[in-house]
Amino acid sequence: MQLNFAAREVAIKLVYYGPALSGKTTNLKALHELTRSDSRGRLMTLETKDDRTLFFDMLPLVFKADTTEGGAMNLRVKVFTVPGQVVHASTRRLVLQGADAVAFIADSQIAETENNAASFLDLRTNLKELGRSMRDVPLVIQFNKRDLPNVRSDAEIDDLARRGKEPVFKASAVHGKGVIESFFGLLDRAWQKLDGEHDLTRKLGIKPEQFMAKAAASLGYAGRERELARAHVGGSIIKKEGA
């Protein structure tokens, strides 16, 4: 994270992590398409001929909100994906460095269970090598490819979510379903963590719920931030007012 209090600007890094072909790049493409044009930059992708990410994808976004002091603040977000193939372990660690929050994109297909587990362990290992832990980094989990046959049932995913602390989202990124909800949850957890560590509410003059309402509008959900906040199983997203 980078803070410029004089300019009232915050820059953060979000990373989409997960096994190969779980839909990380598809999430970013859908996010780019669904976000309002004045809030998104150019999506940069570098793929091989078999549609696998070679190094990383990156999507720049900017969210603007009015402060209680009458000014405005900007949150600049760079959303990265990592290559899922085992041979790119060093690249994943490099991209993960400095991440303010992570979305783990799991493949819902039953046949991909072991790959999901191996990738999650890889995330834990890489964070440890970077001197961090899973407890230190805001995390959301997305089960993608819900439109395919032979996937984990909703009941199985719900049970898994209730046993964990992280919000779990269900998605079909290729159809744009669950993409905004997953990103909104990730952005909110990142903002809440940074606000707690750096007192952004006081220093920037904007409350988390105010900022997230503006972000929801930029994502095409004006006035519907509570709807987005309820789109997960387990975990928690937006704090209740007065809490």
Enumerate the predicted regions with their spans.
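Inter-motif core of Ras-like GTPase G domains
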Residues: 88-111
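Conserved C-terminal guanine-recognition region of P-loop GTPase G domains, centered on the G4
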Residues: 101, 108-164
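Canonical P-loop GTPase G-domain recognition
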Residues: 137-140, 147-200
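Switch I (G2) and immediately adjacent beta-strands of P-loop GTPase domains
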Residues: 40-88
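Conserved catalytic network of the ASCE P-loop NTPase/AAA+ motor domain
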Residues: 51-54, 66-72, 93-98, 129-135
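Conserved G1/Walker A P-loop phosphate-binding module
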Residues: 1-50
